[in-house]
Amino acid sequence: MNPLIPAASVIAAGLAVGLASIGPGIGQGTAAGQAVEGIARQPEAEGKIRGTLLSSPASMEALTIYGLVVALALSFANPFI
């Protein structure tokens, strides 16, 4: 077996998790900033804005979880070995 395959799999697993978490991280930061700005503009809508803000990161984190699943597949059930 070529020793480069396990090494490349570890690097690919790290890149999968790292790159998969960049987008949701930026998205959650933007969403939180816009929510604070919206609450500052309309304090009476705080409840609606907060409810939406607390439910939306669950869908954003799905991308990070997909990256983690790919990394775990490359680490433990490596299809290249």
From Swiss-Prot:
Residues carrying the site annotation Reversibly protonated during proton transport = 61
Organism the protein comes from: Aneura mirabilis
Coiled coil regions in record: none
The transmembrane segments are 3-23, 61-81
- Where does it mainly reside? plastid
Function description: F(1)F(0) ATP synthase produces ATP from ADP in the presence of a proton or sodium gradient. F-type ATPases consist of two structural domains, F(1) containing the extramembraneous catalytic core and F(0) containing the membrane proton channel, linked together by a central stalk and a peripheral stalk. During catalysis, ATP synthesis in the catalytic domain of F(1) is coupled via a rotary mechanism of the central stalk subunits to proton translocation. Key component of the F(0) channel; it plays a direct role in translocation across the membrane. A homomeric c-ring of between 10-14 subunits forms the central stalk rotor element with the F(1) delta and epsilon subunits.
Give the family per the record: Belongs to the ATPase C chain family.
What GO molecular function terms would the record report? lipid binding; proton-transporting ATP synthase activity, rotational mechanism
Question: Entry's InterPro entries?
Answer: ATP_synth_csu_bac/chlpt (IPR005953), ATP_synth_F0_csu (IPR000454), ATP_synth_F0_csu_sf (IPR038662), ATPase_proteolipid_c-like_dom (IPR002379), F/V-ATP_Csub_sf (IPR035921)
Keyword list (alphabetical) reads: ATP synthesis, CF(0), Hydrogen ion transport, Ion transport, Lipid-binding, Membrane, Plastid, Transmembrane, Transmembrane helix, Transport
Q: How does it sit in the membrane?
A: Multi-pass membrane protein
Q: Name one GO cellular component term.
A: plastid membrane
Q: What is this protein called?
A: ATP synthase subunit C, plastid
- Subunit structure and binding partners: F-type ATPases have 2 components, F(1) - the catalytic core - and F(0) - the membrane proton channel. F(1) has five subunits: alpha(3), beta(3), gamma(1), delta(1), epsilon(1). F(0) has four main subunits: a(1), b(1), b'(1) and c(10-14). The alpha and beta chains form an alternating ring which encloses part of the gamma chain. F(1) is attached to F(0) by a central stalk formed by the gamma and epsilon chains, while a peripheral stalk is formed by the delta, b and b' chains.
- Extra info from the record? In plastids the F-type ATPase is also known as CF(1)CF(0).
